[in-house]
Amino acid sequence: MRVGILTFPGSNCDHDCYHVVKHVMGAEAQYVWHKDRLPEQLDAVVVPGGFSYGDYLRCGALARFSPVIADLVTFAEKGGPVLGICNGFQILCEAGLLPGVLMRNASLKYICKDVTIRVEGQETPVTRGLAGQSLTMPIAHAEGNYFADPETLDRLEGEGRVVFRYVGGAPNGSARDIAGISGGPARNVVGLMPHPDRASESILGLEEGKRMFAALLG
């Protein structure tokens, strides 16, 4: 299993994702610079967190125009597994791979804390065998308030594409307590604001995010 880790100017969680995939899970991982083509031999792609392009204009808005995004869209449309974490979720929304947008937190403050999310909806590449489970992992964002129009929210709910929901209410004001959603032809594109990459080793105090990487790597 070979996983590509996209890297943009301002990414800072690409190393975390690389470490988990390669050193914790024992799979092959390679960085993919935003100006390069997506290697054809990849089995999955992770769009990591960080502050791509310094979050100028809007989170993910500039990264959406990076050359690698066209290849990412093609990869996703062919059913390739794509996981977007935090800023990666924002980028996937800006690129049109997932519906909706991530707005400023309702508190207008940066939030960094552990949260518990519940796995819901239909199975995806990162939630195989995890339905109904609660996972605890950190969030660290200022723009994690998921918003979509009521029709889109109803469609996501009806199609089972609300993949993760905050337990006890969304700390950022996210609509319907949504923490993550899926898209793509086979629910193969998943975006979420919490960081499974920061909850995959005992030394960090949390290992429940490791279950998501185990599902992704099959």
From Swiss-Prot:
EC number assigned by the record: 6.3.5.3, 3.5.1.2
Coiled coil start-end: none
InterPro entries xref list: Class_I_gatase-like, PRibForGlyAmidine_synth_PurQ
Reaction catalysed by this enzyme: N(2)-formyl-N(1)-(5-phospho-beta-D-ribosyl)glycinamide + L-glutamine + ATP + H2O = 2-formamido-N(1)-(5-O-phospho-beta-D-ribosyl)acetamidine + L-glutamate + ADP + phosphate + H(+); L-glutamine + H2O = L-glutamate + NH4(+)
GO biological process, alphabetically ordered: 'de novo' IMP biosynthetic process
Pathway connected to this protein: Purine metabolism; IMP biosynthesis via de novo pathway; 5-amino-1-(5-phospho-D-ribosyl)imidazole from N(2)-formyl-N(1)-(5-phospho-D-ribosyl)glycinamide: step 1/2
UniProt xrefs under Gene3D superfamilies: 3.40.50.880
Ligase is among the record's keywords: yes
Glutamine amidotransferase type-1 domain segment(s): 2-218
Catalytic center residues: C86 (nucleophile), H195
Keywords per UniProt: ATP-binding, Cytoplasm, Glutamine amidotransferase, Hydrolase, Ligase, Nucleotide-binding, Purine biosynthesis
SUPFAM superfamilies, sorted: Class I glutamine amidotransferase-like
Annotated compartments: Cytoplasm
Gene Ontology CC: cytoplasm
Database matches in Pfam families: GATase_5 (PF13507)
CDD domains given in the database record: GATase1_FGAR_AT
PANTHER family linked to this entry: PHOSPHORIBOSYLFORMYLGLYCINAMIDINE SYNTHASE SUBUNIT PURQ
NCBIfam families: FGAM_synth_I, PRK03619.1
Purpose: Part of the phosphoribosylformylglycinamidine synthase complex involved in the purines biosynthetic pathway. Catalyzes the ATP-dependent conversion of formylglycinamide ribonucleotide (FGAR) and glutamine to yield formylglycinamidine ribonucleotide (FGAM) and glutamate. The FGAM synthase complex is composed of three subunits. PurQ produces an ammonia molecule by converting glutamine to glutamate. PurL transfers the ammonia molecule to FGAR to form FGAM in an ATP-dependent manner.
Subunit structure: Part of the FGAM synthase complex composed of 1 PurL, 1 PurQ and 2 PurS subunits.
The protein, known as: Phosphoribosylformylglycinamidine synthase subunit PurQ
Gene (name only): purQ
